[in-house]
Amino acid sequence: MTLAEFRRTYPAATFTVSSGKLFTYRYYQNPQAKATLVLLTGGIGLSDLFYKHFARFAGDFSVLTFDYQLQFGDNGEFADAVAELLRHLKEKVWLVGQSLGGVVAQVIASRHPEVVEGLVLSNTCSLSGNMSKAGYQDLMKIIESQRKFKKWLAFLPFPLIKRMMRWAVMKKKTDGFTPQEKAAMEELCGAMMELLTKPYEQHMIDFLCDAEHYFGMTRNDFAPWEGRVLLILSEDDTTFTPACREDLIALMPSPTVVTDLTGGHLALMVRLEQYADLVTKFILERTP
């Protein structure tokens, strides 16, 4: 399935939240499914980059996805809008978040536990109020690097910025990949080059940096999902440090932890079938 075919098969819809703002999403209601997944993309913020995951999961689940839209200025406002949409759709969901999506999942779950069945978080960090000194310092380095990157956006041509982003992904993430795995990453980068705009990239940097305002979460915030949290933390992920990973494990109640899904920070893209099998098995085992 191509991206164009995906968009025709799963057209976008809109919902007006109580603030009057429009929320755009893609939703497939599988009549045979007993669980619904919300796919929360990483820091690029383009949910269509997960179109193969959407199509793969649609065989077993109902699936919902969306971008981190410009009209929602911070994580809290966005989480509240997501909860409104879920109540409108009459859905209680598994939040499946990658990287920044894992952070967004924590904000949604802590603010609106009534719409959440469980969490699947991959190659991400915690919003713990009790994170280690090393973990906190490592996260703040990521946030500060994003603030510096936003300054580049002010004076560098955006086509050059996108080429730099593509080069960084292909250079850093594909060492040792098979030709098929490199092709998957090339496809991802091609879609990113097509879809990403300068205003949205600026918004995504602000959205990521805003996450520091939600530090302070405790294990009690996630107590409703004891035994219903899957953490996929690739050993070869160099974006989040071991300290960040340990802080996340410590925050979650009795999580299942998988570390051997290799492929770096974007392992779920290059190991799609292995990733999908892990997630599907975990959720179906916990679905009556």
For the regions a protein language model found, what residue spans apply to each?
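Active-site loop/oxyanion-hole signature of alpha/beta-hydrolase fold enzymes
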Residues: K52, L64-V96
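Conserved alpha/beta-hydrolase catalytic His-Asp/Glu region
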Residues: F155-C209, F215-F222
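Flexible "cap/lid" loop of the alpha/beta hydrolase fold
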Residues: L119-W152
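Catalytic histidine-centered segment of alpha/beta-hydrolase-like enzymes
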Residues: T239, G263-A276
